[in-house]
Regions:
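Bacterial extracytoplasmic/cell-wall-associated proteins, especially those involved in peptidoglycan
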Residues: 5-6, 10-206
Length: 206
């Protein structure tokens, strides 16, 4: 409702809930909820808090601590992972790749953050001009995580970060079969070989 939207963007309310304007989406855990049409705004947010605490149980909080992240940081990384791949089996691998980059103080270089910075998720190809956008969400020019999530991640997305796959990958490129999955690489030479395969397939597709 409009009342819920107003409350969401109220800075005093955000602070009271323990969030900032950019981390507020982390409150919400996607699920099918049964709510009544006459539920008050306060009751709605109390319900969301209850569901958030239920999801972020002691086990998940311990997992977040073990990987050196707050729940908000996990949520932020999960939002990027889910924009990179729809493949649930691949999500922990992508999460592991970004965590490797964070540990090496490398920019994440995540294209979805550029789309978010430009507020254009319909962009099909990111150009060098797009990479110059002046935004804290530009993970090509800034290291570390962006200030907050670029979407509300699913439970699977969050769990893929908490249970990320350990490997040496720091690069990925869309597969040349256009399956929506990726080829991964631990060095730039292998990454460029993967990229050439993809570009060749892309040019042949035109």
């Amino acid at each position: 409702s409009a009342e819920i939207a107003r409350q969401l963007f109220d800075s005093a309310f955000q602070t009271e809930m323990g969030y900032t304007p950019v981390t507020m989406p982390c409150l919400f855990i996607p699920e099918t909820y049964q709510v009544y049409w006459d539920m008050s705004v306060d009751d709605f947010f109390k319900r969301m808090q209850t569901e958030h605490k239920r999801f972020w149980n002691d086990e998940r909080l311990a997992q977040a601590t073990a990987i050196g992240m707050t729940p908000e940081e996990v949520c932020t990384l999960a939002s990027i992972v889910e924009e990179e791949t729809n493949n649930n089996e691949e999500k922990p691998i992508v999460a592991g790749l970004y965590i490797n980059r964070l540990h090496q103080d490398m920019p994440l270089q995540a294209d979805p953050t550029i789309k978010f910075a430009l507020q254009d998720f319909g962009l099909r190809r990111i150009t060098n001009e797009h990479l110059k956008v002046n935004s804290p969400y530009n993970t090509y020019i800034n290291t570390g995580l962006p200030p907050g999530p670029i979407r509300i991640p699913s439970k699977k997305g969050i769990d893929s970060v908490l249970n990320y796959t350990k490997h040496n990958y720091i690069y990925m490129c869309a597969k040349e079969d256009f399956s929506g999955t990726h080829n991964f690489a631990s060095n730039y030479a292998d990454h460029m070989a993967n990229a050439r395969k993809y570009w060749k397939a892309l040019n042949e597709r035109k």
